[in-house]
Amino acid sequence: MNALRGWLAALGSVLLASAAQLGMRWGMSRLPLPEAWAGQTPERAALLAVALAVAAYAASLLCWLAALRHLPLGRAYSLLSASYALVYLLAASLPAFDETFSTSKTLGVGLVVLGVLTVNARRTAAAPAHHPSRKAP
């Protein structure tokens, strides 16, 4: 059950971090450059998107901390790479981002996904599980 909690927390972290990236990109692309902040009134929707993205990053961090409690670092950390694929797919698919698919980007993201799958593949020889809260005999 602890491993399931870890996987769910890692999934939550990936989804929230991906949403944060997209929200930050959408909001920041609609705000003036910092040197023009004094002379312009920023778009409220853009400010809200950036604020929500920052909140999503904070929630993602909390999920990440929960994932680290239940998963080995090497396994959990590789799962964060799934957000690269998710952000790429969504940014290129959604018209709000004006991003495009390309062969080289798709190949690169495919390699990242292959790496995540490789790191998280089940091992054939079961190694004894070690959990930091359990004391060794």
Swiss-Prot record:
Keywords associated with the record: Cell inner membrane, Cell membrane, Lipid A biosynthesis, Lipid biosynthesis, Lipid metabolism, Lipopolysaccharide biosynthesis, Membrane, Transmembrane, Transmembrane helix, Transport
Pathway: Bacterial outer membrane biogenesis; lipopolysaccharide biosynthesis
Periplasmic side: 25-44, 98-100
Chief location bin: membrane
Gene Ontology CC annotation, any one: plasma membrane
Location relative to the cell: Cell inner membrane
An annotated Gene Ontology molecular function: transmembrane transporter activity
Residues spanning the membrane: 4-24, 45-65, 77-97, 101-121
Parts forming coiled coils: none
Biological processes, Gene Ontology terms: lipid A biosynthetic process; lipopolysaccharide biosynthetic process; transmembrane transport
Keyword Methyltransferase: no
PANTHER family recorded: 4-AMINO-4-DEOXY-L-ARABINOSE-PHOSPHOUNDECAPRENOL FLIPPASE SUBUNIT ARNF-RELATED, SMR FAMILY PROTON-DEPENDENT DRUG EFFLUX TRANSPORTER SUGE
Family: Belongs to the ArnF family.
Record protein name field: Probable 4-amino-4-deoxy-L-arabinose-phosphoundecaprenol flippase subunit ArnF
Organism expressing this protein natively: Pseudomonas aeruginosa (strain ATCC 15692 / DSM 22644 / CIP 104116 / JCM 14847 / LMG 12228 / 1C / PRS 101 / PAO1)
